[in-house]
Amino acid sequence: MDNCIFCKIAAKEIPAQTVYEDGEMVCFKDINPAAPLHLLLIPKVHFDSLAHAAPEHQPLLGKMMLKVPEIAKASGLTDGFKTLINTGKGGGQEVFHLHIHIMGTPV
């Protein structure tokens, strides 16, 4: 997507403090954190929200969910963490590219 800031981060057109990346997803620090540690995990492929996910996204979404605890632990969130997916304007979503918030206080 041409105007999607998260697509631009995934394509390395905009810098971000990346903490994890593979061929399908990238995780970076939120520039406006709501917790001492606030990360965003995004798929490199664009779809607006969880409500826009298609059956072919199921393997990717599963991989992302399983990657969350690994990223949290590697980032120092060893005493627990919170995950959040805002979906749609009414659900508080501000950037319309699916993303998983990973938040907590590093130990």
UniProtKB/Swiss-Prot annotation:
InterPro entries for the chain: Histidine_triad_CS, Histidine_triad_HIT, HIT-like, HIT-like_sf
Motif Histidine triad motif in this chain: 97-101
Location of the HIT domain: 5-107
Signal peptide residues on this chain, from the entry's feature table: none
Pfam families (UniProt xref): DcpS_C
GO MF terms, alphabetically ordered: catalytic activity
Name the record gives this protein: Protein HitA
Source species of the chain: Neisseria gonorrhoeae
Gene of this entry: hitA
